Amino acid sequence: MTHDNKLQVEAIKCGTVIDHIPAQIGFKLLTLFKLTATDQRITIGLNLPSGELGRKDLIKIENTFLTEQQANQLAMYAPKATVNRIDNYEVVRKLTLSLPDHIDGVLTCPNSNCISRSEPVSSSFSVKSRDGDVHLKCRYCEKEFEHQVVLQAD
């Protein structure tokens, strides 16, 4: 018995592949992290079959590389995602994500009275993990929120 494997999303020669994104999260990552703010080609796979997740999203950005800090900020939305650096069609570096200590300029504070919602300042949250739950503390209003509350505010 033979298996014919075919890529469902075209391979890239050089750039970044963000794989194992939970289904329905890919577009949110593109928007929040301003991944489309480039003139490079971006390929998106949505609801692709995945042995581990059932369904997954995938983002490929040609000739663009994420820093480890940028990659780790993705962990809030896609904790099991991997960020692969591609060179000459080969994976040359694979990052496994971990929660960063801070997330800046990406999320919106859910506190409607927070100055980050009305003043020209970038949002800033410190990330705290307690008993497996992730909490975010706003730098400006100093309120602490469960991470799901902050993610839904966007």
Swiss-Prot record:
Its cofactor is Zn(2+). GO terms for cellular component: aspartate carbamoyltransferase complex. One of its GO terms (molecular function) is metal ion binding. It holds the Pfam family PyrI_C. SUPFAM superfamilies: Aspartate carbamoyltransferase, Regulatory-chain, C-terminal domain (SSF57825), Aspartate carbamoyltransferase, Regulatory-chain, N-terminal domain (SSF54893). Binds 1 zinc ion per subunit. Keywords: Metal-binding, Pyrimidine biosynthesis, Zinc. Zn(2+) binds at C109, C114, C138, C141. Disulfide bonds: none annotated. Belongs to the PyrI family. Involved in allosteric regulation of aspartate carbamoyltransferase. This is Aspartate carbamoyltransferase regulatory chain. The lineage of its organism: Bacteria, Pseudomonadati, Pseudomonadota, Gammaproteobacteria, Enterobacterales.
